[in-house]
């Protein structure tokens, strides 16, 4: 793709998200979503092949349906309240329709079917944008409508997302699909706390984006897309392979890594609000995620796949790929929770 065109597309995508997050008028919110959707489709098709074409078509159809639901919610709200303002409370019917539209855009269950397929059909760099940047705009709308949101609907989708995010990843060997199912589960945790403490949702989103970005960047560094190619990383760069696996465990929420902090805080917040059964079910469902990440760690580091002698000698050669920008991400992705008590010393 022409660099000038690619830069324009990226800027349009960023502008679309910024319009959504900063708008106070529902029509400009819808325009921002459309700009964002139309800009990311060429990014998904960057490597032109039938698989990426299929992925971008699935993404377009899903997002177009979600945009239609969004416009329906805006129209219902306009008819019953006469308001275009984002800051004004939504009517109950408009709130439910808006929540469903945002759930479809985020890939929450039961609207999750497109996420693994689209992520698997694209390059790692496109998958990174899809699972991180594309979550910002819908999450900002959910944050703004959180006072009028339907609690039962939100909690039902959250529980389903956490459970399906765990079950779906159990039998996967493709790393992009594993990351996609992990994303579905993380979205479930974020929406579960949305009605209780919206600010905690933003904290969870920030940690999720940090962990997912680090994991994708390290997979891009090794060109790893399957568990088999990840296991060969152990022969080439053992230290890098160890770091990848630590980040995977952090994504699974294993204490004392960074990924455990938001889950811990969400369970604590829900318990304070006299909700005991919900966080218990969520914690049990999250064990599925942790299980497939631990199985990935075991198969990669504690077992050795058949390989040639030449492959076993690669660790002796220095890697020429730049790693300076990844180092701070690795530290934040693994050590934010252990180091966080030390922040009190700065006060």
UniProtKB/Swiss-Prot annotation:
Recite the UniProt keywords alphabetically: Electron transport, Membrane, Mitochondrion, Mitochondrion inner membrane, NAD, Respiratory chain, Translocase, Transmembrane, Transmembrane helix, Transport, Ubiquinone
Give the GO cellular component terms, alphabetically.
mitochondrial inner membrane
InterPro entries the UniProt entry points to: Complex_I_Subunit_2, NADH_DH_su2_C, NADH_UbQ_OxRdtase_chain2, ND/Mrp_TM
Query: How is it placed in the membrane, per its record?
Result: Multi-pass membrane protein
Location comes to: Mitochondrion inner membrane
Q: Name one GO molecular function term.
A: NADH dehydrogenase (ubiquinone) activity
Q: How does it assemble?
A: Core subunit of respiratory chain NADH dehydrogenase (Complex I) which is composed of 45 different subunits. Interacts with TMEM242.
Family of the protein in this entry = Belongs to the complex I subunit 2 family.
Protein's UniProt name: NADH-ubiquinone oxidoreductase chain 2
């Amino acid at each position: 793709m022409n660099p000038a065109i690619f830069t324009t597309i990226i800027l349009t995508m960023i502008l679309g998200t910024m319009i959504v997050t900063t708008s106070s008028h529902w029509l400009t919110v819808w325009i921002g979503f459309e700009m964002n959707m139309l800009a990311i489709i060429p990014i998904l098709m960057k490597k032109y092949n039938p698989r990426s074409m299929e992925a971008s078509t699935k993404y377009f159809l899903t997002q177009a349906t979600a945009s239609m639901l969004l416009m329906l919610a805006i129209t219902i709200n306009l008819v019953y309240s006469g308001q275009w303002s984002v800051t004004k409370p939504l009517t109950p019917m408009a709130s439910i329709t808006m929540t469903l539209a945002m759930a479809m855009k985020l890939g929450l269950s039961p609207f999750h079917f497109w996420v693994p397929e689209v992520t698997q059909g694209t390059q790692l760099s496109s998958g990174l944008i899809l699972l991180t940047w594309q979550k910002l705009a819908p999450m900002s709308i959910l944050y703004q409508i959180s006072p009028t949101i339907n609690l039962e609907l939100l909690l039902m989708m959250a529980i389903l997302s956490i459970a399906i995010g765990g079950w779906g990843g159990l039998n996967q060997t493709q790393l992009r699909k594993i990351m996609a199912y992990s994303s579905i589960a993380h979205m479930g945790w974020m929406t579960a706390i949305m009605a209780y403490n919206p600010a905690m949702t933003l904290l969870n989103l920030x940690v999720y984006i940090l962990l997912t970005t680090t994991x994708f960047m390290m997979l891009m560094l090794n060109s790893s897309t399957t568990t088999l190619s990840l296991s060969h990383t152990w022969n080439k760069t053992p230290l890098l392979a160890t770091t990848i696996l630590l980040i995977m465990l952090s994504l699974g929420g294993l204490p004392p890594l960074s990924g455990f902090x938001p889950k811990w805080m969400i369970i604590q917040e829900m318990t304070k609000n006299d909700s005991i059964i919900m966080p218990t079910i969520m914690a049990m469902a999250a064990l599925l995620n942790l299980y497939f990440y631990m199985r990935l760690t075991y198969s990669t580091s504690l077992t050795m796949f058949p390989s040639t002698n030449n492959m076993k000698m690669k660790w002796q050669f220095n890697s020429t790929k730049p790693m300076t920008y990844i180092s701070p991400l690795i530290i934040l992705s693994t050590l934010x929770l252990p180091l966080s008590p030390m922040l009190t010393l700065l006060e």
